[in-house]
Regions:
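Catalytic zinc-binding patch centered on the HExxH motif and its immediate surroundings
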Residues: 2-8, 17-40, 49
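Well-ordered beta-strand scaffold positions
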Residues: 12-14
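Residue-level recognition of conserved beta-strand positions in structured domain cores
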Residues: 18, 43, 68-70
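Short pre-active-site segment immediately N-terminal to the catalytic Zn-binding motif
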Residues: 38-58, 73-74
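Active-site recognition of the HExxH zinc-binding catalytic motif
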Residues: 57-69
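Post-HExxH zinc-binding segment in Zn-dependent metallohydrolases
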Residues: 71-99
């Protein structure tokens, strides 16, 4: 899957970028800020290449945080178990779609 450079949530453009050094130093594969309209993910983590599967999982995970925050659902957004399961289901539904 190609990683988008940006996407829309309501009227906001959410930018997607790579920040391998900072995220590796923080011990995470991704982070996001709805306030800053930004998702950051890793393509390398502590010098090792991150698999495409993990990169896409991370993008979906952070995208769910952004969507929940946009909806004002901050409690759900802080529930990592919910976000992880929902993001995996969303990815599966997208990737298994038939046209």
């Amino acid at each position: 899957m190609k990683i988008p450079k940006s996407f829309k949530v309501f009227a906001s453009t959410i930018n997607v970028g790579f920040d391998n050094v900072r995220l590796s130093n923080e011990g995470v594969l991704g982070d996001c800020s709805f306030t800053d309209n930004q998702i950051n993910i890793c393509s390398e983590y502590k010098g090792e290449k991150v698999s495409e599967c993990s990169t896409v999982d991370t993008l979906y995970h952070e995208k769910v945080h952004i969507i929940l925050d946009a909806m004002g659902e901050h409690k759900l957004s802080s529930n990592e178990k919910f976000v992880e399961v929902f993001s995996r289901l969303l990815r599966q539904s997208d990737e298994s779609s038939k046209f």
